[in-house]
Amino acid sequence: MQQETTDTQEYQLAMESFLKGGGTIAMLNEISSDTLEQLYSLAFNQYQSGKYEDAHKVFQALCVLDHYDSRFFLGLGACRQAMGQYDLAIHSYSYGAIMDIKEPRFPFHAAECLLQKGELAEAESGLFLAQELIADKPEFKELSTRVSSMLEAIKLKKEMEHECVDNP
């Protein structure tokens, strides 16, 4: 019994060391990057087809298999957002933002979720961050336009709420 406990502890320490050293579950199971890409394509296509629950399952598995690929968390967050699971989507986007701090889509989509929850100040903060990350990146021109529109809408909503308080 003592030997089993020692073996289990050694295994846990080895696993922890492997993961902390940049290892992934996919590496442990010898799942190739090609296989991960095929799974990503499957999940992406399911999402694009409106099969959010199916895509969610695949993105969730991908996040477990390779917790370093921020695309997987963007996809997971998008599925959760599409299914109305805003808090879970925000968690996915937050984790992805930690993985890729220069990716403006994470704070943007988190802001969309926050708006759905009626949390204007928090959403505005996320949009400002997205706007800052976009800064003169032509590949995000469309996103930049959306961010600007949403910031303007929040500003107008705040002004209207302020007027209602001042003039009941």
Swiss-Prot record:
Give start-end of the signal peptide.
Answer: none
One Pfam annotation, family name? TPR_3
InterPro entries in UniProt: T3SS_Ca_resp_chp_LcrH/SycD, T3SS_Ca_resp_chp_LcrH/SycD_sub, TPR-3, TPR-like_helical_dom_sf
Keywords of this protein's UniProt record, alphabetized? Chaperone, Plasmid
Enumerate the SUPFAM superfamilies for this protein. Answer: TPR-like (SSF48452)
Q: Which cysteines are joined by disulfide bonds?
A: none
Q: Which NCBIfam families match?
A: LcrH_SycD (TIGR02552)
State what this protein does. Answer: Mediates the negative regulation of the lcrGVH operon by ATP or calcium. Acts as a modulator of the yop operon expression.
- Name the family the entry cites: Belongs to the LcrH/SycD chaperone family.
Q: What is this protein called?
A: Low calcium response locus protein H
Q: What is the lineage of its organism?
A: Bacteria, Pseudomonadati, Pseudomonadota, Gammaproteobacteria, Enterobacterales
